[in-house]
Amino acid sequence: MRHLISMRDIGRDDILRILEESEKMEAVLNEKGHSDILNGKILATLFYEPSTRTRLSFETAMKRLGGNVIGFTDISNTSVTKGESLTDTIKVISGYSDLIVIRHPSEGAARLSSEVSGVPVINAGDGSNQHPTQTLLDLYTIKREVGKIDGLKIAFIGDLKYGRTVHSLCQALSLFKNVELRLISPDELKIPREVLEYIDGKVLLSETSEINIEDVDVVYMTRIQKERFIDLNEYQKVKGTYRLLKEHVLEKNLIIMHPLPRVDEIDSKVDSLNQAKYFKQSFYGVPVRMAILSLLSKDLQK
């Protein structure tokens, strides 16, 4: 594995390898809190869009592995404001670092970066396209909290059009056996046709605008992504469409996930339930990203 750009670039065996390595990294965190396997290595974090969990968990992961971090979170303080192209930026920064993590508003930006970079590139989100490291921590959460991935029924609820975490996770789940996906969204925010075409025939699919979480194993909530709407009047039409309440899940044998940040789609009273796993899901981002950084570094040396 040279880069991590899209879930379409890796297979089931690659995923299982990363999940296995993530278990080892979680054990390292629980036992010692740190490792030195990336001692002397430098991670560059290039965030052209805001981030809290992804950026900080990558920085934490790198430092837990003994490495160092450079980067930016505000492009107004970079040469981007002077007109420097993305490819020039990547060529320069790949000379300063051993690994690059990039988040960018444009679909395809991470792929373009990987084509000119001298070091491995990790996609931390490119527009509404892909978010592969979130997908891997989502899969790790499912495996850790449910015990398996094959044979599960998973309901995705909310913004399935702009939700890159949904696109990546649906594509990854299509690699597993007997998975059923229930896609619940307003008509205006249905999952893109090209994602449906990719997973069609590989999973059992149903689409609806009504919440139905009977007999599902996993509820994956998402926020309506206001920042992706060109017309805010369109956002107002779908804002607050779905809201998961305590009484909806109290007696159900399922887990609730959310890539965060949350707005109002999960009531805060749900947080205390055993079914609520979204904060644990966020924690799992550290061992999973430790695993990704470690494996990319190892594969580069082969």
Curated annotation (Swiss-Prot):
GO biological process terms on file: 'de novo' pyrimidine nucleobase biosynthetic process; 'de novo' UMP biosynthetic process; amino acid metabolic process
Keywords: Pyrimidine biosynthesis, Transferase
Binding site for L-aspartate: K82, R164, R223
Pfam families in alphabetical order: OTCace, OTCace_N
E.C. number(s) listed in UniProt: 2.1.3.2
Record field: catalytic activity: carbamoyl phosphate + L-aspartate = N-carbamoyl-L-aspartate + phosphate + H(+)
UniProt: carbamoyl phosphate binding residues: R53, T54, R103, H131, Q134, L260, P261
GO molecular function, one term: aspartate carbamoyltransferase activity
Record's function text: Catalyzes the condensation of carbamoyl phosphate and aspartate to form carbamoyl aspartate and inorganic phosphate, the committed step in the de novo pyrimidine nucleotide biosynthesis pathway.
Assembly and oligomerization: Heterooligomer of catalytic and regulatory chains.
NCBIfam families (alphabetical): asp_carb_tr, PRK00856.1
Similarity comment: family membership: Belongs to the aspartate/ornithine carbamoyltransferase superfamily. ATCase family.
HAMAP family (UniProt xref): Asp_carb_tr (MF_00001)
Protein name: Aspartate carbamoyltransferase catalytic subunit
Source species of the chain: Methanococcus vannielii (strain ATCC 35089 / DSM 1224 / JCM 13029 / OCM 148 / SB)
Record gene name: pyrB
